[in-house]
Curated annotation (Swiss-Prot):
Catalytic activities: 4-CDP-2-C-methyl-D-erythritol + ATP = 4-CDP-2-C-methyl-D-erythritol 2-phosphate + ADP + H(+)
UniProt similarity note: Belongs to the GHMP kinase family. IspE subfamily.
Pathway entry: Isoprenoid biosynthesis; isopentenyl diphosphate biosynthesis via DXP pathway; isopentenyl diphosphate from 1-deoxy-D-xylulose 5-phosphate: step 3/6
Keyword ATP-binding attached: yes
Function: Catalyzes the phosphorylation of the position 2 hydroxy group of 4-diphosphocytidyl-2C-methyl-D-erythritol.
Keyword vocabulary terms for this entry: ATP-binding, Isoprene biosynthesis, Kinase, Nucleotide-binding, Transferase
Lineage per the UniProt record: Bacteria, Pseudomonadati, Pseudomonadota, Gammaproteobacteria, Vibrionales
Protein name in UniProt: 4-diphosphocytidyl-2-C-methyl-D-erythritol kinase
Protein residues bound to ATP: P96, M97, G98, G99, G100, I101, G102, G103, G104, S105, S106
Matches recorded under InterPro entries: GHMP_kinase_C_dom, GHMP_kinase_C_sf, GHMP_kinase_N_dom, IspE, Ribosomal_Su5_D2-typ_SF, Ribsml_uS5_D2-typ_fold_subgr
Xref: Pfam families: GHMP_kinases_C, GHMP_kinases_N
Gene3D superfamilies from the UniProt entry: 3.30.230.10, GHMP kinase, C-terminal domain (3.30.70.890)
Gene Ontology molecular-function annotations: 4-(cytidine 5'-diphospho)-2-C-methyl-D-erythritol kinase activity; ATP binding
Enzyme Commission number: 2.7.1.148
Length: 290
């Protein structure tokens, strides 16, 4: 066990496009989507110990410990690896919950990757992704740490290298239930499947966007405003929307025009996750037990 206090990023992600191609017999939606990380997110400070207990601070209001995805990830790793170590985890939370940018899934993946290193359980990315999939469909993307083209019901991942553009990400003050969007009778479910090269050279669309804009006027209003300045769309099922720019200064110029009451940030796309880069830094710095 490595008992140093270590800091780990928990980055946000964007769905640069999202197409719904059909439905499986058991009701899941078949889709094609492109995940890219951004250099903005939460941070976990983790101190491994031999208590066997997982403690997290501060508590997330309205979320009992055993419903916290970080706790679920840590205890799932303990069980999978038959590990008796524990940890105290401090969460610095800046990503919104339920925003479509992967906040909870990213937290779970960061816990898995960090504790696998600190506890020296030596599980592979495939094994960590298997644990993560039981926690949430997006967790494996964060575990693997590369931008990915996802197909099927989201389980088929292949590396992708979209341009690392600058993004202005805005969160309208609404909470959107994914089930409500995927269950809506008017949702497009028959977009033809295309290969990644074709999709990268086609204007990007999110098939959920039309329904979300219809049901949530705040999202529609924010997207209409962003579209005046740059290509913009919904990420996931929302509520976050984003505009893409070729430079940081362009994105920050538009950010400055937003009301102080609007939650927003500027970030750059990253095809290698900041989490993966941090793991490599710790591994190369010879943080080893004495």
């Amino acid at each position: 066990m490595i008992d140093l206090s270590t800091r780990w990023p928990s980055p946000a992600k964007l769905n640069l496009f999202l197409y719904i191609n059909g439905r499986t017999e058991n009701g899941y939606h078949e889709l094609q989507t492109l995940f890219q990380f951004v250099d903005h997110g939460d941070e976990l400070t983790i101190q491994a110990n031999d208590s066997g207990e997982i403690t997290i601070s501060p508590e997330i209001e309205g979320v009992p410990l055993k419903d916290n995805l970080i706790w679920k990830a840590a205890t799932a790793l303990q069980r999978f690896a038959n590990c008796s170590y524990g940890a105290h985890i401090d969460l610095h939370k800046i990503l919104p919950m339920g925003g479509g940018i992967g906040g909870g899934s990213s937290n779970a993946a960061t816990a898995l990757v960090a504790l696998n290193y600190l506890w020296q359980t030596n599980l592979s990315d495939d094994e960590l992704a298997e644990i993560g999939l039981a926690l949430g469909a997006d967790v494996p993307v964060f575990v693997r740490g590369f931008s990915a083209f996802a197909e099927g019901v989201g389980e088929k991942l292949s590396p992708a290298h979209p341009d690392e553009k600058w993004y202005l990400v805005v969160r309208p003050n609404v909470s959107i239930a994914t089930a409500d969007i995927f269950g809506h009778p008017d949702l497009t479910r028959n977009t033809p499947k295309r290969d990644l090269e074709t999709l990268l050279n086609t204007p990007s669309v999110n098939d959920c966007e039309k329904i979300v804009r219809m049901l949530y006027p705040e999202v529609d209003k924010q997207l209409s405003w962003l579209l005046q300045y740059a290509p913009s769309r919904l990420t996931g099922t929302g509520s976050c929307v984003f505009a893409e720019f070729s430079s940081k200064s362009e994105a920050e110029t538009i950010l400055a025009q937003l009301s102080d009451k609007v939650s927003a940030f500027v970030a750059q796309g990253r095809n290698i996750s900041p989490l993966k880069e941090t793991l490599a830094e710790y591994q190369s710095a010879s943080h080893r037990p004495i």
